[in-house]
């Protein structure tokens, strides 16, 4: 949806009147993206946030079609709806279930939850409890009315100075900066500090090679992230389009991206990094 907003200029020949529903569920859906898409293409209540995973036979919660969306009080996250019929959801932390509105790991129980991973009982024990609750590895919260909000992936959390940073919060800031096509935030372990360091990778348009302009873009990214999140990125890496790895369903592969950064694998995909220009 975001690519449509950014890359389609003339919409006069586009007619979406026959489209009744468009579901979004690969990543936590952003209110700003939906609003921009619907405004640009002249549609309303078309995009439906949803949540599911293969281990739960896909559908866990699906927002009702043609129903106004439900943002959380901060306006950052959209509800994916109440659990589907026959599905139970609870949010837990290390101590157990948490109160409404508190973020934690999403756990699911339903007849559709898998019995286990094929020929892998150890992996099964890690994610499925003896009483049938599936640990999804996803972060979220449930409000007092029972609506589920998905905020990110537990394994993607960036811990800087003892504070948890959700990558999508950083990416939401960076993606709105002119000159950035797409971005990803990852945490890279630091042997010196024993903590993680925030790295921002931003794809810029093909042909962007003005050193002064790229340096200015890096400074703006650092400034805006610091203003919005209270942390300065340790490094900002500007890369060519298509560099950020994704799954077949469009999810950012942050662990793979972290490996690419730590292993120096960006190579000629790197355009500019923390003040160092790469031809």
What residue spans do the PLM features occupy?
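Hydrophobic "anchor" residues
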Residues: 97, 106, 142, 148-150, ...
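AMP-binding/adenylate-forming catalytic core of the ANL superfamily
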Residues: 110, 115-116, 139-229
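Conserved ATP/PPi-binding loop(s) of AMP-dependent carboxylate-activating enzymes
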Residues: 79-86, 96-127, 163-165
């Amino acid at each position: 949806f975001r690519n449509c907003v950014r890359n389609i200029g003339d919409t006069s020949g586009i007619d979406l009147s026959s489209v009744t529903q468009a579901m979004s569920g690969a990543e936590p859906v952003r209110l700003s993206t939906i609003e921009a898409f619907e405004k640009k293409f002249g549609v309303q209540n078309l995009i439906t946030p949803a949540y599911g995973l293969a281990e739960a036979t896909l559908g866990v919660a699906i927002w009702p079609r043609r129903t106004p969306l439900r943002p959380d009080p901060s306006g950052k996250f959209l509800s994916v709806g109440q659990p589907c019929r026959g599905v139970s959801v609870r949010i837990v932390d290390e101590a157990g279930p948490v109160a409404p509105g508190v973020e934690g790991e999403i756990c699911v129980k339903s007849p559709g939850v898998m019995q286990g991973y094929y020929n892998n009982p150890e992996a099964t024990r890690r994610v499925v409890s003896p009483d049938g609750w599936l640990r999804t590895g996803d972060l979220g919260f449930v409000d007092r009315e029972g609506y589920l909000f998905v905020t990110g992936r537990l394994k993607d959390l960036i811990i800087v100075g003892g504070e948890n940073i959700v990558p999508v919060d950083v990416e939401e800031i960076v993606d709105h900066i002119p000159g950035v096509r797409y971005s990803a935030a990852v945490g890279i372990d630091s042997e010196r500090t024993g903590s993680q360091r925030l790295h921002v990778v931003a794809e810029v348009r093909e042909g962007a090679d003005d050193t002064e302009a790229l340096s200015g873009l890096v400074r703006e990214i650092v400034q805006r992230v610091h203003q919005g999140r209270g942390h300065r990125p340790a490094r900002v890496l500007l890369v060519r389009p298509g560099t950020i790895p994704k799954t077949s369903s469009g999810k950012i592969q942050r662990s793979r991206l972290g490996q690419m950064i730590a292993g120096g694998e960006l190579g000629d995909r790197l355009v500019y990094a923390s003040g160092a220009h790469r031809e």
